């Protein structure tokens, strides 16, 4: 448990592994493209900001977090990876968004992938998720539901600025509950295509904007 301050990682990186114990880290910083790996097996993981404070762009290189716990991985701060190839973020297990979270793998020269393997949900407050991958892929596993377990996000933004990568969007919400209660922005005028792959999308009262490049296949349901 690293609750009291920032975990500073130097050299190649850090791996935190437990045999089912919980892992709590307030924030993590690096200086030279360090990697961060957290594997709690059956334990819950709670982590705040990772990277994003190094002006040189050589902070945290990549992030991989794994938890099979029913609570899963709680994120309460931004995740920012550095300008180096394979600057990916991989979240294996359920993900809880607590507060404002921006996962940003887009940099000046290299863009990383963002991967989710399971449900993405809010923590019950004002929980906002932004995904910025540039030319990196955003991958949602086949069983991913955004706003799952009847615990919605407040807002959702996916590559709404400048990315041209194709997007495949999983189920949002359930038959009875919205997966996002507020504003939703998916894609931009450079996005190659937006594929709404599932049969169910339940939005709340906020504006929903889905945008793809003109002249392509646009948005498909």
Residue ranges with predicted function:
Residues 1-221:
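Extracellular lectin-like interaction modules
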């Amino acid at each position: 448990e690293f609750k009291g301050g920032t975990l500073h990682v130097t050299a190649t990186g850090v791996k935190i592994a437990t045999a089912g114990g919980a892992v709590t880290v307030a924030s993590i910083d690096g200086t030279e493209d360090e990697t961060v790996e957290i594997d709690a097996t059956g334990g819950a993981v709670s982590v705040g900001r990772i990277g994003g404070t190094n002006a040189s762009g050589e902070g945290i290189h990549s992030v991989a977090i794994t938890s099979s716990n029913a609570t899963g991985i709680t994120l309460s701060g931004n995740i920012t990876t550095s300008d180096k190839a394979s600057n990916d973020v991989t979240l294996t297990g359920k993900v809880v968004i607590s507060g404002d979270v921006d996962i940003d793998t887009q940099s000046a020269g290299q863009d990383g992938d963002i991967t989710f393997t399971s449900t993405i949900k809010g923590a019950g407050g004002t929980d906002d998720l932004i995904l910025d991958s540039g030319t990196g892929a955003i991958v949602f596993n086949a069983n991913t539901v955004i706003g799952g377990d009847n615990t919605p996000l407040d807002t959702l933004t996916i590559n709404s600025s400048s990315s041209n990568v194709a997007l495949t969007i999983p189920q949002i919400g359930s038959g009875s509950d919205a997966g996002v209660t507020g504003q939703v922005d998916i894609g931009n005028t450079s996005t190659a295509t937006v594929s709404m792959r599932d049969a169910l999308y339940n939005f709340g009262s906020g504006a929903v904007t889905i945008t793809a490049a003109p002249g392509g296949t646009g948005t498909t349901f």
